[in-house]
Swiss-Prot record:
This is Acyl-CoA-binding protein. An acyl-CoA binds at residues 30-34, 56, 75. PROSITE patterns: ACB_1, ACB_2. Belongs to the ACBP family. The keyword Ribonucleoprotein does not apply. It comes from Brassica napus (Rape).
């Protein structure tokens, strides 16, 4: 399986987590996903009254400079960590 297919598979797996990841983890995933699928952020930073959009923009901007492959690989790693954490908490 290629990196792109593995990335797409993990993008689907994250939707099936039974426990919602923390906001921090969601923002990390968002930034990596956008960097992997769109590339560098090209829009201006949202205003301070759009806190949710601003946080998402900041998460995307934080991974600026990563290649598509790096972003995909980091995304896969993060999803695997979340899946492992969920599995260990379910068996505890």
């Amino acid at each position: 399986m290629g990196l792109k297919e593995d990335f797409e598979e993990h993008a689907e797996k994250v939707k099936k987590l039974t426990a919602s990841p923390s906001n921090e983890d969601l923002l990390i995933l968002y930034g990596l996903y956008k960097q992997a699928t769109v590339g560098p952020v090209t829009t201006s930073r949202p205003g301070m009254f759009s806190m949710k959009e601003r946080a998402k923009w900041d998460a995307w901007k934080a991974v600026e400079g990563k290649s598509t492959d790096e972003a995909m690989s980091d995304y896969i790693t993060k999803v695997k960590q979340l899946l492992e954490a969920e599995a260990s908490s379910a068996s505890a």
